[in-house]
Amino acid sequence: MKKTIMLAVAFIACISIFAQTKDEKYAEDVQSIDAILNAYYDVISGSSQQPWQFERDSYIHSKNAVIIRLDENGNTNPHTLESEYIPMGLSPRQDFYEIELKRNVNHFGNLAQVWSAFEIRTDPNITSDIRGLNSIQLHYEKGRWFIDSWTCEMESEKNRLVSDFLNEN
């Protein structure tokens, strides 16, 4: 009898955990600008043993989010979030940590613009010299924040944008 009751309780607990909607699972990620930016860095970072968090990443972005990368000559490579996932899903995951170094937020009404400097590491505790700057646009709708787009440029020998951004007051 005790075994049956224990199994029933375990079954109900599993159903309630796995039956959560995305809104229930990731609601805290989108309640503030800080929360969504922390989730943004969290979903991309992790060890090679951790699975990609595609569902969570998709949830924090708006449906038609655009990603733009600038090369060292200023040329753009715009694409959708879904096309970002394709190469990630096709190759084995490696240890990768995008660590935020500094954030500047401008927030007016339901709009926000975030400048965020980051460093790419293969170990979260060992600094690296691979750095970049994100420009992230967000909007607030239906009680939550969405990332609409982000543009990234990596620091290079001829463009010290992260150093300049970190040295700003």
Feature-to-residue mapping (PLM):
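Short, low-complexity N-terminal intrinsically disordered segments enriched in polar/charged residues
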Residues: 19-54, 59, 167-169
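A short, polar/proline- and glycine-enriched secondary-structure boundary/capping micro-motif
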Residues: 78-80, 125-128, 157-164
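Surface-exposed, charged secondary-structure patches
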Residues: 66-67, 76-124
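A mature extracytoplasmic/lumenal domain signature
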Residues: 71, 116-118, 151
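Short beta-strand edge/turn micro-motifs at domain boundaries
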Residues: 131-161
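Bacterial Sec-dependent N-terminal signal peptides
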Residues: 1-24
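Hydrophobic pocket/interface hotspot
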Residues: 40, 55-57, 65, 114, ...
